[in-house]
Amino acid sequence: MPVPCGSSCGRNAFMRRPKTGDTLCKECFFLAFETEIHNTIQQEQLFRPGEKVAIAASGGKDSTVLAHVMNLLNKRYNYGLDLVLLSIDEGITGYRDDSLKTVAQNRDDYGMPLRVLSYQELYGWTMDRIVAEIGRSNNCTFCGVFRRQALDRGARLMEVDCVATGHNADDIAETVIMNILRGDTARLRRCCDIKTGSKEADTIPRVKPLKYSYEKEIVMYAHFKKLVYFSTECVFAPNAYRGHARAFLKDLEKVRPSAIMDIIHAGEQLQIKGTVKKPVRGVCGRCGFVSSQQPCKACVLLEGLNRGLPKLGIGKKSKGERMVALQEQQLREKAHLVKNDF
């Protein structure tokens, strides 16, 4: 027997929302999904009229839905935003080269300018070459660090006011779990922020419009909207630490469907004792990009690769980082002595 749509629109329901349990027809689900994202944008004041916003586009379901919804809401509610696409090519054969075709499709569909930056262009390395050097045990460390900085570099090149990323509720809950398991108190609180960075701190802000959107609903939205997205998993991802947190979260969700939002809200309410030493975010003296250490992690990892010591910067506070920091200090001291001689 057909179940009527819970919004009393007169149509039959076709789904039960994973997030709320509401039975909705396709049209009402679309509207509810889009309205929730709009409300998040408004309540958190993520954008201001006239801003140039770069959408971090990978071609996957999250960034594809983000590009579609941002384009739709920008017109529906007259945000007055200048939307562009920013993609990073890590140099993973059979994965990123194919996903960039989907990004190009988004560019054509929504008429958004697209800028693609590659690891080869920025660092002189591709992930294929990096994995050949270090193996698959720590490859995600390199990729994550380089990708975060690449987005900052791309945002600066495109002269945007902020970067919108496709992080969804599942992603954030997984990150909370990972940081708890690692005992990383600094990142544990920051990972729940819907907006990070600021122009005052000379960093281009990043925002997460999909912060409260469930991954299951993003997939359903993309499927029923017939959006074209790239669904193949990264060939280097199976060994990622995040996979264990994801599996744990899925098990929790089976027992308690609200577990995802519960974990996010717990992270948001977390308060760290004043006696706990927190890293101070500044600017790397070598590359000029945001960092909480000198030199930044990207510079340490890159130096290791270039010197034939690919594991130089691996670890929470690696020997390599201490060595590079000491070299930086010695160079500054030498420069100071030379300056005094004149």
Swiss-Prot record:
Gene3D superfamilies: HUPs
GO cellular component: cytosol; cytosolic tRNA wobble base thiouridylase complex
GO process terms (BP): protein urmylation; tRNA thio-modification; tRNA wobble position uridine thiolation; tRNA wobble uridine modification
A GO MF term: tRNA binding
Pathway(s): tRNA modification; 5-methoxycarbonylmethyl-2-thiouridine-tRNA biosynthesis
Entry keyword annotation includes RNA-binding: yes
Record-listed E.C. numbers: 2.7.7.-
Keyword Ion transport: no
Pfam family, one: zn-ribbon_14
Compartments it resides in: Cytoplasm
Enzyme class: transferase
Keywords for the protein's UniProt record, in alphabetical order: Cytoplasm, RNA-binding, Transferase, tRNA processing, tRNA-binding
Transmembrane stretches, start-end: none
HAMAP family: CTU1
Family from the record: Belongs to the TtcA family. CTU1/NCS6/ATPBD3 subfamily.
Function: Plays a central role in 2-thiolation of mcm(5)S(2)U at tRNA wobble positions of tRNA(Lys), tRNA(Glu) and tRNA(Gln). Directly binds tRNAs and probably acts by catalyzing adenylation of tRNAs, an intermediate required for 2-thiolation. It is unclear whether it acts as a sulfurtransferase that transfers sulfur from thiocarboxylated URM1 onto the uridine of tRNAs at wobble position.
Protein's recorded name: Cytoplasmic tRNA 2-thiolation protein 1
